[in-house]
């Protein structure tokens, strides 16, 4: 039973880490577009950037929560 819970939490941690990587990549792409002259005046890019940053914050919070729960379960 405990092993099942640990495996589930490890899977959640891995999923969060994959989501963090994907979101960071998306942010980098948007930031590169924002650095161009035409991108600098594109408000949609700024809105997308803001949404991605908020999404990243949420995923990191989830990752921290699940990671702590995993550590507590292992100990």
How would you name each of these model-derived features?
Residues 1-75:
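Charged, heptad-repeat coiled-coil alpha-helices that serve as long linker/dimerization "arms"
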């Amino acid at each position: 039973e405990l092993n099942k819970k640990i495996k589930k939490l490890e899977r959640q941690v891995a999923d969060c880490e994959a989501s963090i990587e994907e979101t960071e990549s998306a942010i980098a792409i948007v930031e590169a577009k924002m650095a161009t002259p035409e991108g600098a005046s594109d408000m949609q890019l700024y809105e997308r950037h803001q949404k991605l940053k908020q999404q990243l914050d949420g995923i990191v919070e989830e990752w921290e929560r699940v990671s702590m729960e995993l550590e507590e379960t292992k100990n």
